Amino acid sequence: MEKVVNNQMVSQSAVTMMLIQMLICLALPIGLAVWVIKRRSHPKKGATKIFFIGMGIFFLFAGILEGPFRGIARQFQHTPWAYALYGALLAGVFEEVGRFLGFKFIQKRIPDKINDPETPFLYGLGHGGLEMILVGSMTVLSNYLFAMLINSGSIEKVLSQTPASSRSAITAVVKQLTGMSA
């Protein structure tokens, strides 16, 4: 197996920016929700529920129900436009149906909040906030962990224990993080 890193390291500024990005991805949606619910929402009744309904709908529709259909996308991996179109349609259908049902649920369970201008904001903050936390911070966490492995000199050992089917994807990430051409 060829050596991937060749004494390359991930710069300290890149590692610092990863940590800042992770902090933003975690703190921004939660901080905004707390601020809106405590300071802005009138009446406060139902505001927290709306935020968590948004989170729940994202988790259910994008995280669980959409999952089985992602396997079909592998058929389109070698055709970028079809892969992008399928992914966009899949996300669009599941997330929009989820939003529709989420607002129907709010309309039925918290009817006095349905016309409140903060309702769609709080719902979107829950929906997008969970996406930001799960997708944004977890991606950065993965890159951060790879950076730590690279900088400690342990990445070659990890790659040697990695199944061949995953090795090329990890090698591409390593090369991207170290600034080497992929």
Predicted regions and their residues:
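Hydrophobic alpha-helical segments at protein termini of multi-pass membrane proteins
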Residues: 2-182
